[in-house]
C-alpha cells in the first residue's frame, strides 16, 4: 500500500473496495500535488468519503485499460490533463514535440491527440451506459463550438464530440461536490442540469428560458462574423454574479452552459490545500526518472486563483475567471513548513505566485455586488480609476516566509504584473521585490512593444513597461546587485504587421537584449486572440484585424526577434525589405543586418544571377548583458 490513491485493482482491493465510486482518467502521469488538477479533484472526493481509482495515461489502442477497475458505481471522470492534449503534442508551428513534461521521463506519445474525446469513446465502447463527466482545461476551453488550429476548422463542443454526459468547466471543486452528491442520491446523470459551472446537451424544446442565444454551430462554421459575435457573447457571460445561461444549438441538440460556479471562499480554498497530497509523482514512475513537470512546482506555493489582467491570448479568464480568490496567511505558511520538511529541500522556495503573483485584492470594491465590468479591462490600456492597488498583504506574507526555519531565500520567478506594480504609489513592495525575491532574473511579460499589437493583446502600452524597466534597474543598481529582467515576447500575434515586428526588433537592439527563446502566437482553443486569428475580426469592435498566417511571414516575424543569429539573416533581410525598412540593412551601428555580399565568382556571373549572395554579415552589437543571463526558461 502507498499513500497515493489506488492505481491498480490490487491496490483498490487492499482499501476494502471492489467497485470504486469514481474512476478518474487523466492524460497526465499521476502526480499527487495541488498544481495538478487531478490531485485536487481526487483528494477532494476522497475527503468526502468517496472511493476513487486513478487511471493515468491509459493505453487507448484497446479497451483493456479502461476496464481495469470495472464500471464505477457513480461515474467516470475524464480530463486531458494540465494542458490541452494538442498543445502537449504540437508546437505553434504544428511540429510534433519530442518531449512531454507531464509524462514519466518526459517521454512523448503517452496520451492520444484530443485525449478527452478518445478516452470517452473508449469508455463507451467498454460500458455503453456508464455515466461520464468531463472537466479540466481541455474540456473547459472547448465547451462551445471552437476554432481548432490543428484541423484549421471549427469543431463542435467537446461535449458533443466526446459523447460524455456532462461537462464541468472552470475550477471544479463546487461542481464535482454537487455532482457526486446527486449521483450518490441516485439521480441519473442525464437529469443533472442545474449545477453552476457545468454544460449539458438537451433537446431544443427543453431549453431553459432566459438564456443568451449564441449563433449556432452551423452558423459559426460558415460565417466568421457570427463566430466573432458568439465569442463576445460567451465571454460577456463568464461572471458569477452577472453571467446568464448561454445557449448554442448543435444540430438537433442544444448546448446549455449554466452560469459560472461561485468562487471558493478563502476557507474553502484553504481546505483544498490542506488535503493530504504526497507532493510528488507516484513511485511507479521512479524507474523512468519521475515526471519532469513536478520540478517547477515542487518547492513553489500558489497563493491565489483568478486574474483580472484578462489578456486576450490567455485562457485564464475563461477557465479560472477574473475574480481573485486568495489563501490565508496561515494556509500559505502551513504549506511552506511542509515544503521545508521535504528531504530534498535545499532552503529555496522557488515561487510564491499564481496566475498573477502580486494580486491579493479584488480589482475594485463594486464587483462583490455588481460583478466584473463587461467588455472592459481593469488594467489595459491603462489602469481603471476604480482599481484597488495594495501590495501590503502579499509583502507581509513574503516576510513571514523568509523568517521560517530552514528557508534561505524566497523567490518570485514569474507572474509579476508590472503595470500593477507601477500603479502602486508606495514602492515598498517594488524595492523589497528587487532586494529579496529575484534570483538573478525576473521574468515579466510585456509581450510586444507596438501599442497597436498590445491593444489587440489586451496588454498595457509599452511606456508602462519602460517605466518599470527603468525603475527596476535603478533599484538594482542602488543595491549593488547584478540582476536582469527577462521579458516574455511574442511574435505574429493578430495585429502584428511586419512593420510592427520591426519595432520589436529595434526595442531589443536599443536595450541590448538577445533573447535565446521566443514564442510565436499559439491559437489555443477558446481565447479572444484565437477568435481574431480565425475571423480576422476584433470580436469587441467587429473591425478587421491584420493576422500573419503564412509560414513565411511567421518565420520572418520570429526571426526579427533574433535578428543577430546568422541562420536568421536571410529571413531578416526579406522582412526588412517587405516592411520598407531598408534603412536598417547596412554596416552602421543602428542597422540590424549587413547587406548581401557577393563573392568573386558570383560577381563574374552577376548578369546571370543578380540575386546570388553569401550568408556573411556583421556580428551583432554586444548586448548590455549577456544572452546567458537573459535566458528564458
What are these regions (language model features)?
Residues 25-28, 288-315, 340, 348:
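N-terminal pre-triad scaffold of radical SAM enzymes
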Residues 84-93, 141-143, 173-178, 202-208, ...:
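Flexible glycine/acidic-rich beta-alpha junction loops that bind and position SAM and/or redox cofactors
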Residues 165, 272, 307, 332, ...:
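Conserved, mostly hydrophobic/aromatic
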Residues 1-19, 29, 225, 229-300:
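N-terminal [4Fe-4S]-dependent radical SAM core
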Amino acid at each position: 500500500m502507498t499513500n497515493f490513491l489506488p492505481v491498480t485493482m490490487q491496490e483498490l482491493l487492499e482499501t476494502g473496495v471492489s467497485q470504486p465510486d469514481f474512476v478518474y482518467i487523466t492524460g497526465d502521469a499521476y502526480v499527487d500535488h495541488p498544481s495538478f488538477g487531478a490531485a485536487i479533484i481526487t483528494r477532494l472526493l476522497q475527503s468526502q468519503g468517496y472511493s476513487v481509482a486513478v487511471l493515468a495515461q491509459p493505453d487507448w489502442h484497446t479497451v483493456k485499460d479502461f476496464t481495469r477497475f470495472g464500471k464505477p458505481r457513480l461515474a467516470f471522470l475524464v480530463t486531458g490533463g494540465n494542458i490541452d492534449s494538442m498543445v502537449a503534442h504540437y508546437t505553434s508551428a504544428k511540429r510534433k514535440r519530442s518531449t512531454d513534461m507531464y509524462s514519466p521521463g518526459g517521454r512523448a506519445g503517452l496520451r492520444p491527440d484530443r485525449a478527452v474525446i478518445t478516452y470517452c469513446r473508449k469508455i463507451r465502447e467498454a460500458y455503453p451506459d456508464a455515466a461520464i463527466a468531463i472537466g479540466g482545461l481541455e474540456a473547459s476551453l472547448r465547451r462551445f463550438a471552437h476554432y481548432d488550429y490543428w484541423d484549421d476548422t471549427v469543431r463542435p463542443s467537446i461535449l458533443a464530440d466526446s459523447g460524455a454526459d456532462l461537462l464541468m468547466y472552470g475550477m471544479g471543486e463546487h461542481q464535482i461536490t454537487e455532482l457526486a452528491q446527486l449521483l450518490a442520491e441516485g439521480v441519473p446523470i442525464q437529469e443533472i442540469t442545474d449545477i453552476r459551472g457545468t454544460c449539458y446537451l438537451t433537446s431544443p424544446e427543453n431549453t431553459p428560458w432566459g438564456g443568451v442565444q449564441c449563433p449556432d454551430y452551423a452558423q459559426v462554421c460558415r460565417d466568421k462574423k457570427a463566430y466573432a459575435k458568439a465569442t463576445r457573447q460567451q465571454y460577456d457571460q463568464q461572471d458569477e454574479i452577472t453571467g446568464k445561461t448561454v445557449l448554442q444549438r448543435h444540430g438537433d441538440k442544444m448546448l446549455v452552459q449554466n452560469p459560472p460556479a461561485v468562487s471558493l471562499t478563502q476557507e474553502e480554498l484553504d481546505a483544498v490545500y490542506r488535503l493530504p497530497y504526497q507532493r510528488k509523482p507516484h513511485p511507479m514512475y521512479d524507474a523512468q526518472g519521475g515526471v519532469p513537470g513536478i520540478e517547477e512546482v515542487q518547492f513553489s506555493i500558489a497563493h491565489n486563483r483568478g486574474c483580472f489582467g484578462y489578456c486576450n491570448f490567455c485562457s485564464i479568464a475563461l477557465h479560472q475567471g477574473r475574480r481573485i480568490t486568495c489563501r490565508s496567511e496561515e494556509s500559505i505558511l502551513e504549506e511552506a513548513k511542509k515544503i521545508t520538511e521535504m528531504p530534498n529541500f535545499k532552503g529555496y522556495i522557488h515561487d510564491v505566485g499564481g496566475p498573477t503573483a502580486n494580486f491579493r485584492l479584488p480589482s475594485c470594491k463594486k464587483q462583490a455586488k455588481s460583478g466584473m465590468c463587461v467588455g472592459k479591462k481593469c488594467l489595459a490600456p491603462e489602469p481603471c480609476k476604480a482599481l484597488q492597488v495594495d501590495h501590503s498583504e502579499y509583502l507581509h506574507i513574503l516576510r513571514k516566509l523568509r523568517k521560517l526555519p530552514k528557508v534561505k531565500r524566497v523567490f518570485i520567478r514569474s507572474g509579476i504584473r508590472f503595470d500593477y506594480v507601477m500603479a502602486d504609489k508606495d514602492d515598498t513592495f517594488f524595492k523589497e521585490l528587487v532586494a529579496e525575491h529575484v534570483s538573478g532574473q525576473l521574468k515579466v511579460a510585456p509581450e510586444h512593444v507596438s501599442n497597436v499589437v498590445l491593444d489587440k493583446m489586451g496588454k498595457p502600452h509599452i511606456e508602462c513597461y519602460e517605466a518599470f524597466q527603468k525603475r527596476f534597474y535603478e533599484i538594482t543598481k542602488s543595491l549593488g546587485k547584478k540582476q536582469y529582467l527577462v521579458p516574455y515576447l511574442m511574435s505574429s500575434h493578430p495585429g502584428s504587421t511586419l512593420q510592427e515586428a520591426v519595432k520589436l526588433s529595434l526595442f531589443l537592439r536599443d536595450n541590448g537584449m538577445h533573447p535565446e527563446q521566443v514564442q510565436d502566437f499559439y491559437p489555443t482553443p477558446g481565447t479572444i486572440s484565437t477568435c481574431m486569428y480565425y475571423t480576422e475580426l476584433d470580436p469587441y469592435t467587429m473591425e478587421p484585424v491584420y493576422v500573419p498566417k503564412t509560414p513565411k511571414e511567421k518565420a520572418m516575424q520570429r526571426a526579427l526577434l533574433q535578428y543577430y543569429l546568422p541562420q536568421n539573416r536571410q529571413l531578416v533581410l526579406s522582412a526588412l525589405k517587405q516592411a520598407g525598412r531598408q534603412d536598417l540593412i547596412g554596416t552602421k551601428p543602428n542597422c540590424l543586418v549587413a547587406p548581401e555580399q557577393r563573392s568573386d565568382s558570383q560577381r563574374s556571373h552577376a548578369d546571370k544571377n543578380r540575386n546570388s549572395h553569401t550568408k556573411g554579415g556583421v556580428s551583432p552589437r554586444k548586448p548590455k548583458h549577456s544572452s546567458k543571463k537573459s535566458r528564458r526558461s
